[in-house]
């Protein structure tokens, strides 16, 4: 009987020792944590945010983002606009030296002048597109009606007829003459014969006159002793 009592008395002690080795739970602390979590407003984290601090405060405001600055718009005087327009008419793409020279004349900064030229080129392209847009819907026949009618030429052009040349009068071989007198007489006779040719018909051009014929024999005649 005494042994059984000792065993029953030792069982609760063993349970207490085993339970002391297990981690103790704090239900009160867990309850407090759930209350704090439920009272805080839900915060959404950005998809690309890291594991650091949240970018949003519990009140819903965003931290670290600067306020957007309002751009200052430059107003140009009529004198400045006149100078800029005249420079734009001369050159639509001025270089850095031209912009600096224009900045000294107008009293503006070089950056402001560069922006003005960019806006002016964009405005001109927009105006050109607005002018060409109504003409894009016209057909070729309607567009040709705006062109002036071409008047027919009162004179008709006919190609000239082919030029016919007569045979050269000196193409045949001439016999050699023993003296210069005979050669001179022959050349004179041939010159008299050339104008006797029939005149060229209308529309045909005669060949240019032949070059003067050189005498075939220039040696003086030998006297027989």
UniProtKB/Swiss-Prot annotation:
GO terms for biological process: pituitary gland development; regulation of transcription by RNA polymerase II. Residues 215-225 have a biased composition (Low complexity). Residues 1-12 have a biased composition (Basic and acidic residues). It is found in: Nucleus. GO terms for cellular component: nucleus; transcription regulator complex. PROSITE patterns: HOMEOBOX_1, HOMEOBOX_2. Keywords: DNA-binding, Homeobox, Nucleus. Residues 69-128 bind DNA. GO terms for molecular function: DNA-binding transcription factor activity, RNA polymerase II-specific; RNA polymerase II cis-regulatory region sequence-specific DNA binding. Residues 64-74 have a biased composition (Basic residues). Residues 1-76, 197-225 are annotated as: Disordered. It holds the Pfam family Homeodomain. Possibly involved in the ontogenesis of pituitary gonadotropes, as well as somatotropes, lactotropes and caudomedial thyrotropes. PANTHER family: HOMEOBOX PROTEIN PROPHET OF PIT-1. Belongs to the paired homeobox family. This is Homeobox protein prophet of Pit-1.
